[in-house]
Amino acid sequence: MKKFTAVLTVIALAVSMPGASAATKIKVSPQFKVSKKNPVVTFKVSGLPKDHGIYISQCMDPGRKPGGVKVCNPSEASKLWVSNVEADQAMGAKAGTGKLTLKVDKYFEGGDCIHTTCVFLVTNDHSAADDRSEDQVIKFKFGGINLF
């Protein structure tokens, strides 16, 4: 009977455990009609990790795996470091509570966000680089008519 109770307890705990998903929630505006003339997007971030931050980068779409990203925009203007840790903010991280903006490029070295799909790749920062729990891929598109 003790073994049965122990097994039942383990099963109950396993069923009640939340699935693996990023705790940080990110909203992008605009997401699917980014201006070609003024390509700036705004992020609203909630649920940041308490002991480290996240990176947000403009990249080519990796397909189904976040680890599959091959080409990201090398421009510092197309990257964000977001953290609510004071020491990180002292080193240049943006607070997750304010207005977060990012300039994105239509084209960058090895990247074409007009004719292919681009994404914002979200990962844990250097303080938790091996932890993949915050990995997210958020697709975005430039708006308007392509005259090519």
Where are these regions (language model features)?
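Extended, solvent-exposed regions of the mature portions of secreted/cell-surface glycoproteins
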Residues: 23-148
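Secretory targeting and sorting signals
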Residues: 1-22
